[in-house]
Amino acid sequence: MKKLASLVLAGAMAFSLAACGNNSTPAGGSSANAGTSTPAASTPASGGIEPIELTIYSPGNENSVPTKTIIEYARLVNEASDGAITLDVHHSNELGSDAESIESTRMGTIDLIFAGTSGFTSFYEKAKVLDLPFLFDSAEQAYEVTNSEIGEQIFSGLEEFGLVFLSEGDNGMRHISTTNRPVHTAADVQGLKIRVPESQLYLDVWQALGATPVALALPELALALSNGTAEAQDNATYHLVANATYDDIKYFSNINYMWMGCTMAANANTWNGLDPAVQEILKEQAKAAAKYSFDTIATDNETATKTLQDAGVEFDFEPDVQSFKDALGGDAYYDQYKDESWYDQELLDAILAEVR
């Protein structure tokens, strides 16, 4: 824990984005107690593993699925190791934003990280393939692909950057919700001021669809929707409730246009110094935690849908998704990135072969 002291202090003072979907503590909510851990063993467990404590972090608040996931992961690991492996759980921006905490994990200040996959792409561009629009029709497809050999192929190169890939979790399919008009077809977004994350890939999509994308950090979103700077947002269903960004929302359209992942990774030096038996438990339970995140997103989306409907939001559960795909030109849309350093045609073809 000594190595965390300075980072905890810095994280407590920093104003940063929340994890994996950029969640922040909702109004009226209370911050969960960060720094929780499963009970540590004082003697070797029945499997002969020496007691060990590792730090795990996800920047989101207690309502975010990534934070729920690392809490469950800590439980699973402790149980599978007969109490020998303790994961010291931190969350709620305590150790910084996605970008800050990923860098801290690369440096070894944090042992294990579960953060938005997009946060890794600033230095690991190969993962940008997962930010392509309409790559997956559902979260179920994303799970099958990213937790297969293809997922290992996408993320194996992380070791060159001081990280070891463990599993890929879920943070939801992105949809569109608006303050001023229903959206059923691609034609309905013409000129629409839609807030998107500060990512060129997101900007490209909405510009191609004829909307007016506005790149804003998440903490600016609620105010932007209130004052008209933005008229729409693209987020997973549960994010609107977890982030309290639905007060001005009147319409919600389930277009499933982009999937958001969360990546579980370990500091490479920490990982390489672990007993192989510990590595096996961490890897296997990371896969179980990834599945937990997908299942929990599904449940939280259902709950959030009811909350939004009770607040008067009108849902279009069957929009004309094909009109959006057609407006982008189908899979040919991806060709514009062929000259980008991160573009890998063979990898993209492997993904498409699984989902088309």
Name what the model sees in each region.
Residues 2-23:
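Sec-dependent N-terminal signal peptides of Gram-positive bacterial secreted proteins and lipoproteins
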Residues 7, 12, 34-36, 42-43, ...:
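Short stretches within intrinsically disordered, low-complexity N-terminal or propeptide regions
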Residues 18-39:
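Bacterial lipoprotein signal-peptidase II cleavage site
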Residues 21-28, 44-140, 150, 158-356:
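N-terminal secretory/targeting leader peptides
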Residues 155:
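Conserved glycine-rich "GG(E/T)P / GGGxP" loop and the immediately following alpha-helix
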